[in-house]
UniProtKB/Swiss-Prot annotation:
The gene is bioW. Its cofactor is Mg(2+). This is 6-carboxyhexanoate--CoA ligase. Belongs to the BioW family. Catalyzes the transformation of pimelate into pimeloyl-CoA with concomitant hydrolysis of ATP to AMP. Homodimer.
Length: 245
């Protein structure tokens, strides 16, 4: 198998990026589709497209995608409350296990909201249960790399008119991080006009419309236990090749 990574920029500013894991006979087709994706991106036509092709030498991990649940909400306040409740329920388990004060759960969730609303990060922020940021570089955050979804999962998602290409990328990220040591994730899109976000826990990928308003920044936060081996987990979410099916 081969890894293909595309990065496109305009005037030195990142416009789009995507990656795929491919068999040898599909490299050409996938390389074309990645170039097309870069050329016709909503953020504008790039002036530079980098395409990197690498042979994958380590074993690929296949993961079943977490269940997709689309929720209904027509305003940001309700959406934030829904996401808070899902996160609170999950975090309570880990606060209890680690003997932590339940009163601090909402402060932790507020910290995550502040990070996603501030935006402007290429990767994700990582918070432990005390709200400490754990990334080496908090400007960049951590990147989840070497992932793809099976053709069957892509077709299944796109056959549902409510779901989008963004769901495909996001379900791959959420499934990988939840299987590699993180407790939960919250995400809003960095695309100004895309207001569907999600909260992911082991119970599901909860898609929540209006998790931000149009025109606002977006971001990603992963939650992790304080005792987790972050060096090992960060290395795995970046390097272990995963196909989500
Ligand atoms: C979805 O519609 O399921 C994806 C929501 C998150 C999008 C994040 C992004 O692509 O920027």
């Amino acid at each position: 198998m081969f890894s293909l990574k595309m990065r496109a920029s305009k005037d030195g500013v990142h416009v789009s990026g995507a990656e795929r894991i491919s068999t040898e006979n599909k490299i050409e087709e996938i390389a074309n589709s990645l170039i097309k994706r870069a050329l016709f991106h909503e953020n504008g036509t790039p002036d530079t497209i980098n395409l990197k092709l690498e042979k994958i030498t380590s074993e690929i991990t296949y993961l079943k995608h977490i269940p997709i649940k689309t929720l209904i909400s027509n305003n940001k306040e309700t959406s934030r409350n829904i996401s808070r409740n899902i996160l609170r329920k999950e975090l309570e388990v880990y606060f209890l296990k680690n003997g932590k004060d339940f009163g601090k759960i909402d402060i932790l969730i507020d910290t995550a909201f502040e990070i996603i609303d501030k935006g402007n990060m290429r990767g994700a922020a990582v918070l432990d249960l005390d709200g400490n940021r754990l990334e080496e570089d908090t400007e960049k955050g951590v990147r989840v790399k070497n992932i793809d979804t099976s053709e069957e999962l892509k077709s299944k998602i796109l056959a549902d008119s409510k779901l989008t290409d963004r769901t495909i990328d996001a379900i791959a990220i959420a499934t990988k991080v939840l299987n590699f040591g993180f407790i939960a994730e919250i995400c809003t899109s960095d695309n100004y006009s895309y207001n569907i976000g999600y909260v992911a826990t082991k119970s599901g990928y909860f898609r929540i419309p209006n998790l931000k308003n149009e025109g606002e920044f977006g971001g990603r936060v992963f939650f992790i236990e304080n005792s987790a081996n972050i060096e090992e987990i960060f290395e795995k979410i970046e390097k272990t090749p995963v196909i989500v099916y």
